Amino acid sequence: SELFRKKLERALAGQPKGSGILHVHPRFVSIAAGQKRKNLLWAEGRGYSLKIRGDEAVMPGEFRLDFEKN
């Protein structure tokens, strides 16, 4: 969704480009990806390669970003 993308945009601000894992509550995997993977493609266009993982420990509507160490 657009709201999720805006939250993601704020979280990525200032982060170095690279690969990472976006942890979301399992019910929010589809929302995090966006319609036709729009949110993932948006991030890719800005230099971030993100994979989404369902994680019961993450509150619904929230997310956690873990970037791979280079």
For the regions a protein language model found, what residue spans apply to each?
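Auxiliary Fe-S-binding modules of radical SAM enzymes
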Residues: S1-N70
